[in-house]
Amino acid sequence: MDEIKIYKDQVSDFVEAAAHDLHAPLRKLSILVDRVFTKHTEQFSADAKEYVTRINACIEEMRSLVDGLTELAKADAHASSVDCDLNIIVQQTLDVMNEEIKEKRAKVAVDPLPAVKGSYIQYRQLFKNLLENAIKFTNKEISPDICISSEPIGKDEKSFFNLPPDKKYYKIEVDDNGIGFNQVNAEKIFEPFVRLHPKAEYEGSGLGLSICKKIVDNHRGIIYAEGDEDKGSRFTLILPETH
């Protein structure tokens, strides 16, 4: 088990170092494009300006992809075990996302959540990804309405999910009124780079939910999704009190 942990940590460190090296040329490329555009903007035709816009969009997409791969590697690393009050973690996440929430006029209701043991950093990433997902995949005419609720797992549900009967678990649900998805894709959406909707309409690396899956797996929990096209989604987490 220690060898597996060491290997995962080494992979995570390698990917993080590689991501740092990849970001450097991307920064330089972005600076050079901006300089050329600023210096010669009056000489640029409408087509040339459009090409510059596309180049910048590609640079940002590459940055997003590199960052996503870094987070995916981190999520695969060993999960530490410290006290994590999910109420605090979710509130801190909402505070960081405040501008995005205001811009989208989103409403987020959060019921009392449990305290669990696990990786504080990974749980922050988990709820950040789920909330970003809920806000992003919405109909443009409708303001996002998100609810996070929680309850202890009972005996029957433990049996259904084949969970140890002597261990305490919590079920946490993240509901939204977004564009939803076809239920046949409920497992597929947790695979890396899977996109159910056009990239032109909804930006992103396609890694957010696969990172969520890695984090929950690290904590020996369960995550699954339920969707209804054009009506919304529900992401359910089954998390142990300790892992």
Model feature map: region roles:
Residues 220-226:
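Glycine-rich ATP-binding loops of the HATPase_c
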Residues 82-95, 147-150:
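A conserved beta-strand-to-alpha-helix junction within the catalytic ATP-binding
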Residues 143-155:
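Short beta-strand/loop element within the Bergerat-fold HATPase_c
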Residues 208, 212:
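Short alpha-helical Gxxx[C/S/T] motif in the catalytic ATP-binding
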Residues 14, 39, 43, 51, ...:
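Flexible helix-coil linker/loop segments in the cytosolic histidine kinase module
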